[in-house]
């Protein structure tokens, strides 16, 4: 004869607590799995960025034209990472797995940065072919403008002081260009139309560097004001991320200048100094360019 089942309220309460503990542990473990997957996904993306960059440099060195097509891929990956960053850090844990694949809910800053990166990638593609050089430069010009929109996206950016400084710096740059660089181009046989186009292009780059620097400076001031310990804040990770966008913009500018140096070196028929050869080295220019784009992409983590 089977023994009767005795229902005890204490046993039910104990069982309920055990089930709740089990569910909690499962949720906790699931959260850990999500975190590990996210971490692995970032590592995979950064590995792809570095690997494709090295692959392009090797293909270029070995004159493998078929594989040089991977040149735009590193910057495309950076644009994708920027959008994913916003997706993951603005959603709850239960949605993170989906957001690891499909970007959504990006900030205004991230949108402008990612658009600039994707436009740069298109420019990289066109620059693979000499007959599309102008097309590539155009896409890079629009990419710079997109970065300017990102750096100035804050409503408090354009104060009278900042606006006056921006106008003054651009005017000074134009004057120096016309007084020093323009005559040099004339001696080298460069047409006036090309020299004027370069003036417009470099003016946009100078504006990008200035707006990125002002944005970083204002962010640093905010960080310092929130904590009176100035020295610890200056060397904190927050200050680093606040400054990284300006560093990236300057590196981007330097990479463009290195392209200009390389073109001038070619016109000089090899009669150039060792420093100019180094500055005009294509591989070094690409590394500086990728570092600049990486820093600009990394600036999205400030938000």
Swiss-Prot record:
What's a Gene Ontology MF term here? hydrolase activity
Q: What does UniProt give as GO cellular component?
A: membrane
* InterPro entries found in the cross-reference section: TMEM86B-like
Which keywords does this chain's UniProt record carry?
Glycoprotein, Membrane, Transmembrane, Transmembrane helix
List of glycosylated residues:
62
Chief location of this protein within or outside the cell = membrane
The induction comment states: Down-regulated by Pseudomonas aeruginosa, PAO1 strain, infection and by phagocytic stimuli but not by Pseudomonas aeruginosa, PA14 strain.
> Is Electron transport found in the keyword set?
no
Pfam families named among the record's database cross-references? YhhN (PF07947)
Q: Topology versus the membrane, per the UniProt entry?
A: Multi-pass membrane protein
> What stretch or stretches form a coiled coil here?
none
Residue spans crossing the bilayer: 39-59, 69-89, 109-129, 132-152, 165-185, 194-214, 234-254, 278-298
The signal sequence is none
User: Can you say where in the cell this protein is located?
Assistant: Membrane
**What protein family does this chain belong to?**
Belongs to the TMEM86 family.
**Which protein are we looking at?**
Lysoplasmalogenase homolog
Task: Give the organism, scientific name.
Answer: Dictyostelium discoideum
Gene name, per UniProt, is tmem86
